[in-house]
UniProtKB/Swiss-Prot annotation:
Enzyme nomenclature, EC number: 5.4.99.25
Gene: truB
CDD domains: PseudoU_synth_EcTruB
TM spans (from-to): none
Catalytic reaction annotation: uridine(55) in tRNA = pseudouridine(55) in tRNA
Keyword Protein transport: no
Keywords linked to the UniProt accession: Isomerase, tRNA processing
Active site as annotated: 45 (nucleophile)
GO biological process: mRNA pseudouridine synthesis; tRNA pseudouridine synthesis
Similarity comment: family membership: Belongs to the pseudouridine synthase TruB family. Type 1 subfamily.
Domain of life where this protein originates: Bacteria
Protein name in UniProt: tRNA pseudouridine synthase B
Coiled coil: none
Described purpose of this protein according to its UniProt entry: Responsible for synthesis of pseudouridine from uracil-55 in the psi GC loop of transfer RNAs.
């Protein structure tokens, strides 16, 4: 029988495993801590891994601030395959031959995604149109017009070149769909592409290196978890007096 536990307050950095939704992560932590007031500051797709900022107790009050911070990612883009979800979890819609691009050509194409821009969200997303999440419409084979959203990409670097794949490092504003950048890059190159892997490495000052895996957190006694919590005033010093 689960015993009532001390109510905790603070920010906990978690390394999300693949094949978990962001809701799955929150649910596991709620069971571990036996408390409901737990949220997060930025969704990761099931395929993606890496940093999730979990908000426990009173830390849920700074959700909007933490969600607004820039994110950093490392990932892999695969050329030649287009999927319906724009990532490796989706069904392949088309396969095209990949031209013998040079590293310089890939870097030049990536440079075209730098700076301020408007991005059309993918159909496989939780954004609602007329009250219906886009992914529900997409699963039924439908498609609706989506309003482009402002984003900013402040860095987009090539870190490994091995066609048909290449690795990258990216820093962007909230609400940026990295898989859409991968898809759109493939369209510009004329051979299609999808996001093959993604790992969030930072959200502003919060780093993946300081996070624990879910399994590690679940194995810790409550006092040890409490020691890992970042106080609310420290997580958001500019808005907490």
């Amino acid at each position: 029988m689960i015993q009532p536990r001390k109510e905790l307050d603070g920010v906990l950095l978690v390394d999300k495993p693949t094949a978990h939704t962001s809701h799955d992560v929150v649910a596991r932590l709620r069971r571990k801590l036996n408390m409901k007031r737990i949220g997060h500051a930025g969704t990761l797709d099931p395929m993606a891994t890496g940093l999730m900022i979990l908000l426990i107790g009173k830390a849920t009050t700074i959700s909007q601030y933490l969600t607004s911070l820039d994110k950093e990612y490392e990932g892999t883009i695969e050329l030649g395959k287009v999927t319906d979800s724009q990532d490796a979890d989706g069904e392949v819609l088309s396969t095209l031959p990949v031209p013998p691009f040079t590293e310089a050509e890939i870097r030049a194409a990536m440079a075209g995604f730098m700076g301020d821009q408007y991005q059309t969200p993918p159909m496989y997303s939780a954004i609602k149109v007329d009250g219906v999440p886009l992914y529900k419409t997409a699963r039924k084979g439908g498609e609706v017009e989506r309003e482009p959203r402002f984003i900013r990409v402040s860095s987009f670097e090539l870190t490994r070149f091995a066609l048909p794949q290449f690795d990258f490092r990216l820093r962007c504003t909230k609400g940026t769909y990295v898989r859409t950048i991968a898809h759109d890059l493939g369209q510009r190159l004329g051979c299609g592409a999808h996001l093959a892997a993604l790992r969030r490495t930072a959200t502003d000052k919060f780093k993946l290196a300081d996070a624990l895996t879910l399994d590690a957190i679940e194995a810790l006694p409550l006092p040890e978890i409490e020691k890992r919590l970042i106080p609310v005033y420290q997580a958001a010093p500019s808005i907490v007096g």
